[in-house]
């Protein structure tokens, strides 16, 4: 199985890069992990609705170009489903049992995700109604993916 994380925007903070690298290293025991950073579109401060839509469409095209036809896609969106960690672990396990060999996670840019990306997703997932910096969400998500694998192994890490 391969896990892929597609994100919009460049991660600059070293402490976040270090944390993500640590969890990717730990995940190496279970899966191949690929992280793909896509260029974000610059959003003017007073962007109109049509400008925002055009930005979402451009970013969405870049995202979808990196998604495989047979990938199981989980996109982060505020309106998505919230999972307890144990259920999230089962969701990943079920995806592989349904024949998906690649699981792709998507974190959009500052405007979120285009409707086309959301439509392509097999599952929309939310970490709640709070707003998080997109860069921090990468670390939180990668840790939760690692936690899911540890839960599947019956490891005490989750306790």
Curated annotation (Swiss-Prot):
Where is it predominantly found?
A: cytoplasm
Q: How does it assemble?
A: Homodimer.
One annotated Gene Ontology cellular component of this protein: cytoplasm
The signal sequence is none
Annotated InterPro entries? Alpha/beta_knot_MTases (IPR029028), RlmH-like (IPR003742), tRNA_m1G_MTases_N (IPR029026)
Positions with a binding annotation for S-adenosyl-L-methionine: 76, 108, 127-132
Name of this chain's protein: Ribosomal RNA large subunit methyltransferase H
Q: What family does the entry list? A: Belongs to the RNA methyltransferase RlmH family.
Main enzyme class: transferase
State the function annotated in the UniProt record.
Answer: Specifically methylates the pseudouridine at position 1915 (m3Psi1915) in 23S rRNA.
Q: Which organism is it from?
A: Streptococcus thermophilus (strain ATCC BAA-491 / LMD-9)
- Gene Ontology MF terms in the entry: rRNA (pseudouridine-N3-)-methyltransferase activity
Cite the entry's keywords alphabetically: Cytoplasm, Methyltransferase, rRNA processing, S-adenosyl-L-methionine, Transferase
* Statement: the UniProt record of this protein carries the keyword rRNA processing: yes
Q: Does the keyword Transmembrane apply?
A: no
HAMAP family named in the record: 23SrRNA_methyltr_H (MF_00658)
